[in-house]
Amino acid sequence: MSLLDCFCASRTRVESLRPEKQSETSIHQYLVDESAISRPPPSARASEVICSTDVSHYELQVEIGRGFDNLTSVHLARHTPTGTLVTVKITNLESCTEERLKALQRAVILSHFFQHPNITTYWTVFTVGSWLWVISPFMAYGSASQLLRTYFPDGMSETLIRNILFGAVQGLNYLHQNGCIHRSFKASHILISGDGLVTLSGLSHLHSLLKHGQRHRAVFDFPQFSTSVQPWLSPELLRQDLHGYNVKSDIYSVGITACELASGQVPFQDMHRTQMLLQKLKGPPYSPLDVSIFPQSDSRMRNSQSGVDSGIGESVLVSTGTHTVNSDRLHTPSTKTFSPAFFSLVQLCLQQDPEKRPSASSLLSHVFFKQMKEESQDSILPLLPPAYNRPSASLQPVSPWSELEFQFPDDKDPVWEF
């Protein structure tokens, strides 16, 4: 059966999905000669998985975001029989075009097909009339993009970036091993649970290299609805020429995401579309120090041997404004440093020639991630604000599902993306 032979039988009927059990050569001095580090955190126990398809079992608490081009609302909800907090994504299938329905089908079937702790899980999928309901674990920290907006507007520390990227790239490596290109690797598609588990979402953009039982070396399909993800897309994907693109396109997106996490801003974000495309396709190779690719700000990067060093040689000093966030444990100093290993990682990912970029497996062996071998999954928690584990006592559940009428205004930024 093709991966696109989804369980979405029609616009108004979806069969319930329930989870079922089921060393590369160094290319750079910073890519160590060892097998890829693998420390997958445990996935949810069977007793914790919510499989109910009865809509009355879910008490919607609050809308926490939207996605899928504003067609999907994302809610924090309580599974009343167990008291477990879950995420409920609700999409009106009648509002979806055929292309969007195919994207939904792809996300639903692939979430069921893939089983990896660093890939976002759908516990169950069902319909209520023409509304598609997707039940998944509640990720208490939301997305890395939301963390940037709320707590780290000037960018994250190198240690936090390492923890987040390591988990996300592990999920990406799993997809690549299964012959799939993600095509939408970015901070808003990286989710973090309350216990520090990092997962990769955004499967609706995914494309398979497998066709008729054979794995192709390149694909030529241009992703639908790509306008919002263009800053992260690779030059060869945007070029749309006879050479096509492959999994190395995702590695370029990892480099852009690393810059996004480090600066708090998306490279190319404020550029006119034509200017962005020209710079990616014809411009000279750039690095995290190339301020011309970032939105205008007061932040300035410069080389320095002073300041707090990360422990790996000479550091790069980033001047930012001092600010204190809501948690006493979080404080962004007036200067933060990035090691040569971090810049090596970014520059490797942003190579214009995709053949010069490392694979996801090789990237996990990069010296930037070397410390992850000695750190546990919960080592990320001291770097984050307190997790949102339960609704506030003053927060009242929204109206019963039968009384809700969903209208999604265009002026609200999505916190989570489908």
Curated annotation (Swiss-Prot):
TM ranges: none
An annotated GO BP: negative regulation of extrinsic apoptotic signaling pathway in absence of ligand
Domain Protein kinase: 58-369
Keyword set, alphabetical order: ATP-binding, Cell cycle, Cytoplasm, Nucleotide-binding, Nucleus
Subunit-structure text: Component of a trimeric complex composed of STK11/LKB1, STRAD (STRADA or STRADB) and CAB39/MO25 (CAB39/MO25alpha or CAB39L/MO25beta): the complex tethers STK11/LKB1 in the cytoplasm and stimulates its catalytic activity. Interacts with BIRC4/XIAP. These two proteins are likely to coexist in a complex with TAK1, TRAF6, TAB1 and TAB2.
PANTHER family in UniProt: SERINE/THREONINE-PROTEIN KINASE FRAY2, STE20-RELATED KINASE ADAPTER PROTEIN BETA
Protein name in UniProt: STE20-related kinase adapter protein beta
Organism: Mus musculus (Mouse)
GN (gene name): Stradb
